[in-house]
């Protein structure tokens, strides 16, 4: 695991083995709150989204009127930005675009709806309602995301309010699942650590509730609620966020070592549980400044792994979470959204200054970080008994797509039948899988019988168990290449290659995204594929197996048909030269195939293969 202890973030090594760290000069942090006046925003040339938020009336915009316009399945461009805060994206079926364009038809518009499910825990009753929604409004599919929640795809505009009412009926919502806010809060799911999971889940839920936008716009628009009377006083309507919310998305996770299945270093804010000998939480290490997204061809954008900023007692964790988020609210870049995430804020002003401001807002110093160790970021498949005697079954769900597959697993129907008899709860994992959790010992046989009856998968090959893919085409408007629809075929090819070198059971993380936004966190995967164009990908290698170190660009613009041939000699070399217990990403660096990435600022340095790879 790479060291993420606090350091002077200014000391960024230049390329080369003998480079001397150079002291960076940081900018002076701002001292004022974000601009909320329209004229001042124009004068300062703030990003377009800032103007939209200022004029939105706390996320209302013209959404209510737009829903009544039946001549189009879309909404206005400005409302398309605001609806994200309500948990939705306007999309269209890109497979149908050419034919519809030829016929001079409007795009096949629909909406993706994302739920807010802190910690990924839902009851069987909620599962059944979500299943009904999937069958009625979303083409018979639920999608477990890489951030422990569900998405619906293909919901048309005329069904939006009915869908939202059904979600509300499950005592769930979609508020802040997208947008410039604190999004769904993830929590560790390791079923063997029952006590620690309870603490992690509770912290995730507390943060989610505390940092939730307070505007009543969601209930007014989607559930026909009455507008709350009381004026537009910022302190009253949004006491934490203010009128303009955050500069950009903000993602929070809670991890429990030794498992890093939430990929804590890839997120803006994280809490790492520090456990005593009885597996009880004594406090939390706080991480800040992680994030995956970047833009092809723009080196001032980069992924970054989070720094461990300090240690807090359990009673201070919530105050620290709010302080970190509000510093980002006030310091984040509101002129350039490509440099607006917390990772860039810390690079701009320095970790020391950021920590000092957090401590000022909390009213006390953070403690020194406590030792911790992560050993991987995968799930534990099959049955696991928790330390309270309850049982937990983790099912492998390819790319999180819960639907009935012709000639294959009947995920939607099978999990519905399980929900009808299950007495515990369900947990979604950050690896897009489902845990049937808290099963009494006497109910295991009944669950097993249903799993077998519907062909549900308890596991898969080592490579597939360690895989993630974003949705990409046909619904994501940002996708440059296939991801979810392509990765299974690629893994079949790579499984053959790995088996030929005696590596069939070697755990190697592989992740694919259709664009460099990195929703499946490819830049902390030992093999990362990032869409560059139709059937072309950038290939990234050399990340840490536990998600603690970024990868490096190994080869640009690789044709899909060439990926196996590119990786095969590297697999051969790994099989010949690895040390006991050495992971693929670590070996590629030690053997000199690819340079080590220290952190975000040097992500674009020393790219490419450092030496030829051969089979012989």
From Swiss-Prot:
EC number: 1.8.1.2
Bias kind Basic and acidic residues: ranges: 1-10
InterPro entries registered for this protein in UniProt: CysI, NiRdtase/SiRdtase_haem-b_fer, Nit/Sulf_reduc_fer-like_dom_sf, NO2/SO3_Rdtase_4Fe4S_dom, NO2/SO3_Rdtase_4Fe4S_prot, NO2/SO3_Rdtase_4Fe4S_sf, NO2/SO3_Rdtase_FeS/sirohaem_BS
GO cellular component: sulfite reductase complex (NADPH)
Cofactor(s) the protein requires to work: siroheme; [4Fe-4S] cluster
Coiled coil start-end: none
Residue ranges, compositional bias (Low complexity): 11-22
Region (Disordered): 1-35
Reactions performed catalytically: hydrogen sulfide + 3 NADP(+) + 3 H2O = sulfite + 3 NADPH + 4 H(+)
Annotated pathway: Sulfur metabolism; hydrogen sulfide biosynthesis; hydrogen sulfide from sulfite (NADPH route): step 1/1
Function: Component of the sulfite reductase complex that catalyzes the 6-electron reduction of sulfite to sulfide. This is one of several activities required for the biosynthesis of L-cysteine from sulfate.
Protein name according to UniProt: Sulfite reductase [NADPH] hemoprotein beta-component
